[in-house]
């Protein structure tokens, strides 16, 4: 079995793979003030709840966009699992050719998603990840990572609205029947959700055109992340949702580097 960790700005997602099957996964809050032992205690509880033992784990791989937390996580893995984890970054084999001006600038999460999507779909791709930031990534059939777009995430955008507009209440992000709304709560909900769906469709249409102009076939659009399902219900551009895309990418990269 292997343990995979996707460390994001808001959450850490952990998964356990037995061969190619994801048998357990959990979500913890990202907190760079926690010590290795505090994270270790949390992981002990999760393993115990699922009748798993640390001795079952033969390898660990981590993807992180939060450098300040890595010391605690690496120390936790070393202390509790007695394993040196693979850290996704320069020098790790991914099979993806990064065409960025400076490849080191590309977030590990974006590369991991590209690895998974290329492995699964084997076609030109646009990958949308609805995380703390929303990212759009273009990947060719030949596994060339062309680049993409980064937007403020849905929660960041809505939090900014609530923080800066004193009279506007915080609302649950749920779909409204339409956009001509009769109260403030529904008006905010429709603005965020339908506005974001429109943003997705416009960026995807522009990205598709640019990829086709480069000689690619029409890309397949796959979405992942916490708000993927909500936005996909209104977006006309998303072909498929893959909720475990990042975890799958970590598994594939582990296999390439073990």
Swiss-Prot record:
The annotated pathway is: Cofactor biosynthesis; coenzyme A biosynthesis; CoA from (R)-pantothenate: step 1/5
Cofactor(s) needed for function: NH4(+); K(+)
- Enzyme class, top EC level, equals transferase
Q: What are this entry's molecular-function GO terms?
A: ATP binding; metal ion binding; pantothenate kinase activity
Q: Which GO terms describe its cellular component?
A: cytoplasm
Write out the annotated subcellular location. Cytoplasm
Q: Where is the active site?
A: 109 (proton acceptor)
Binding positions for substrate per the UniProt entry:
100, 107-110, 184
Binding locations of ATP:
6-13, 132
Q: How cofactor binds (record note)?
A: A monovalent cation. Ammonium or potassium.
A GO BP entry is: coenzyme A biosynthetic process
* InterPro entries assigned: ATPase_NBD, Type_III_PanK
What EC number(s) is this enzyme filed under? 2.7.1.33
Keywords (alphabetical) are: ATP-binding, Coenzyme A biosynthesis, Cytoplasm, Kinase, Metal-binding, Nucleotide-binding, Potassium, Transferase
Question: In the UniProt record, does the keyword Nucleotide-binding occur?
Answer: yes
- Which family is annotated? Belongs to the type III pantothenate kinase family.
Recorded hits in HAMAP family, A to Z, give: Pantothen_kinase_3 (MF_01274)
The record's subunit annotation is: Homodimer.
What exactly does this protein do?
A: Catalyzes the phosphorylation of pantothenate (Pan), the first step in CoA biosynthesis.
Which PANTHER family does the record associate with it? TYPE III PANTOTHENATE KINASE
Q: What is the name attached to this protein's record?
A: Type III pantothenate kinase
Native source organism of the sequence = Clostridium botulinum (strain Loch Maree / Type A3)
Recorded name of the encoding gene: coaX
């Amino acid at each position: 079995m292997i343990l995979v960790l996707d460390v994001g700005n808001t959450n850490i997602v952990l998964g356990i793979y037995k061969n190619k099957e994801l048998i357990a996964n959990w979500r913890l809050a990202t907190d760079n003030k926690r010590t290795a032992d505090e994270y270790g205690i949390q992981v002990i509880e999760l393993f115990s709840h699922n009748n798993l033992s640390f001795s079952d784990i033969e390898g660990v791989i981590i993807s992180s966009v939060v450098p300040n937390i890595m010391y605690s996580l690496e120390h936790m893995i070393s202390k509790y699992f007695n394993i040196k984890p693979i850290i996704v970054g320069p020098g790790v084999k991914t099979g993806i050719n990064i065409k960025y001006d400076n490849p080191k600038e590309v977030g590990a999460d974006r590369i991991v998603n590209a690895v998974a999507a290329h492995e699964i779909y084997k076609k030109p791709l646009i990958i949308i990840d609805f995380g703390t930031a929303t990212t759009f990534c273009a990947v060719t059939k030949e596994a060339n990572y062309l680049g993409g777009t980064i937007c403020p995430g849905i929660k960041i955008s809505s939090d900014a609205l609530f923080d800066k507009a004193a009279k506007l209440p915080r609302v649950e992000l749920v779909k409204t029947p339409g956009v001509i709304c009769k109260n403030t709560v529904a008006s905010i909900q429709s603005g965020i959700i339908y506005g974001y769906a429109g943003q997705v469709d416009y960026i995807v249409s522009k990205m598709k055109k640019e990829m086709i102009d480069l000689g690619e076939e029409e890309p397949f659009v796959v979405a992942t992340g916490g708000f993927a399902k909500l936005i996909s219900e209104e977006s006309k551009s998303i072909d498929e949702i893959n909720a475990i895309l990042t975890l799958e990418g970590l598994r594939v990269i582990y296999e390439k580097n073990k």
